[in-house]
Every structure is written in C-alpha cells, then in structure tokens.
Curated annotation (Swiss-Prot):
Enzyme class: hydrolase
Keyword Cell cycle applies: no
Lineage: Bacteria, Pseudomonadati, Pseudomonadota, Betaproteobacteria, Burkholderiales
Protein name in the entry: LexA repressor
Positions of the catalytic residues: 152 (for autocatalytic cleavage activity), 189 (for autocatalytic cleavage activity)
Alphabetical list of SUPFAM superfamilies matching this protein: LexA/Signal peptidase, Winged helix' DNA-binding domain
Organism: Polaromonas naphthalenivorans (strain CJ2)
C-alpha cells in the first residue's frame, strides 16, 4: 500500500478533514495525476483495506458534504476534485517543506476552443480566452486548456463544457487520457496501443472505440493532467 501524507490540518478557512478523509482525497488526487481519471469505489476500498466499496462510498459522501469533491451520479468514476480543495491539498504539502510565504509562479493558460483542420492546436485563432492559475494546482504543468465537447468521457467525470488541462506530448502509455487529432477532428479519449493498431476508447457505452488504421492521419497532441469544471471557470 502506498503511503499518504496527513492533510487533516488544513488552514482554518478550509474544511477540516479526518485522517482517513485526507487519505482518500490524496488517493483521488494521485489517481487523477497518474492516469487522468479518479479511482472507482472498489479501487479505493482495495487500496485502503475497506471490506466493501460501500465503506468508500460513505467516506466520499462525507467529503462531498464538506465541499472538497463533487460526486457525479450514475458513473463508477464520477468523482471530481473541486479546484479550491485541490489548491488546499497542495498548499498543505508545500507548507511541510517550505516557508508559508514562499509562493509558486502563476500559470497563464490559453483556452483552446474549436480547432480548424490542418492548423496547430495552439494557433492564435483557436484561443478563446486566457486563464490564470497557481502552478501548485497541477501535479504536472499543463500547456493549455481544452474545452471538452460531448459526453464520450462521461463515466470518468469529464463532462461537456469542462476544461481539460493538457500537457503537450507526442507519446502516451496505455490507459492515459489523451488529446488526439484524427484527420480533421480533435478528440479526448483513453489511449490504447495493441501491437500495430491504436485504439481511442470512450468512457461511455454509447460511444464505440475508434480504431486508427495504418496510414490514417493521426497525431497525439497531449496528455490530460487536470480537469476544471466548466461552471467553476465562468
């Protein structure tokens, strides 16, 4: 079992968490940072030694009640870290190793809307606006935000209108959430390479896998490193 830091002593203006709640919050954060998706209730139960996923569900409900996560009904991975709780969690980690007055740089992230065929994803005409975030909000520093369109990734909590934080990359590991360009379309999917074929997998049974055929125009644009709910970014 991986070790966890104790984040129960959050600042006074933040919800106070029990040690177990802090462990679960850190587990969620680690899973999103490493795989691009939150854990299932069963995975939380297995990681922390609970007898059943129901115990994990009760802790998640308590965290949601305290306002540090949001639960999306009807999906096994429907857990979202609220932006302010992610910041508090990172501030707690940083404060263990550096003076409270030390602050990290602010990130300037362009928001990419619709992408025209054949042009770079960060071309000026694609940028709708610019957002500013503390760099400590992200485990890996993103290069841009992409507005999610559609519900193909619904079951891991990525919804239409959300802003996906993306780090530019040309390679991906199986299971990572990627931004890919296939022909004239840019899409967010789970990456899987099977021998010589690449599959782009949805997280919604209503959407079939996309199989990239040999010779078909395909380009990996980046890896998902964070998610911001669209309503929080208004």
């Amino acid at each position: 079992m991986r070790t966890f830091n104790d984040f129960s002593g959050l600042p006074a203006d933040r919800p106070k968490l029990t040690a177990r709640q802090a462990q679960i919050l850190e587990l969620i954060r680690n899973a999103i940072a490493q795989t691009g998706a939150p854990p299932t209730r069963a995975e939380i139960a297995a990681e922390l030694g609970f007898r059943s996923p129901n115990a994990a569900e009760e802790h998640l409900k308590a965290l949601a009640k305290k306002g540090v996560i949001e639960l999306v009904s009807g999906t096994s991975r429907g857990i979202r870290l609220r932006t302010d709780s992610l910041q508090a969690l990172n501030e707690s980690r940083i404060s263990q190793f550096s003076p409270p007055v030390q602050r990290l740089e602010q990130l300037t992230l362009p928001l990419v809307g619709r992408v025209a065929a054949g042009s770079p994803i960060l071309a000026q005409e694609h940028i709708e606006r610019t957002y500013f975030f503390e760099s400590r909000l992200f485990e890996q520093q993103p290069d841009y935000l992409l507005k999610v369109r559609g519900m193909s990734m619904r079951d891991i909590g990525i919804m239409d209108g959300d802003l996906l934080a993306v780090k530019q990359a040309r390679e991906a590991k199986n299971g990572q959430i990627v931004v890919a360009r296939l022909g004239d379309e840019v899409t967010v999917k789970r990456f899987h390479r099977n021998q010589h074929l690449i599959e782009l997998l949805s997280e919604n049974p209503d959407f079939k896998p996309i199989v990239v055929q040999p010779g078909e125009p395909f380009e990996l644009e980046g890896l998902a490193v964070g998610l911001i709910r669209g309503s929080l970014a208004m």
